Amino acid sequence: MTIQASSGPSSALEAVLADLITVHHELLQLVREHRVAISRNDAAAIQELLSRQGMLGVRIAALEKARGEAIRAITGSARAGITEVLSKVEAGDRAGVAAKAEQLRSVLMEVQRQNGIVRAATQSLLGHID
């Protein structure tokens, strides 16, 4: 994690978003490996990948807490949406925060899509067991 003292709440938010992007890319890679392990019916690999995904979940939770704190520093509410956040950050910081938020949204959508594929593959495998 690169959470560190920064020149202001906008910089802190941008750093947290960058870390969230990195961790979610790591998660995406694990989900893809999970899909391959399912296709090979490799129980040991599946177990190991689930464990690693769980560890990333802990990192994501810590980053989400930091993200909420940065958003609270900007807007007064940890749950403010990106539109409100962007309306309250300084103009010079707006483009960077918006770009990171969009990158995070994009990787989250891909993680969700890949998780759907893994879920379907798991159900298919379980169907063969029944």
Summary of predicted features, one role per range:
Residues 1-36, 43, 47-130:
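C-terminal-biased regions
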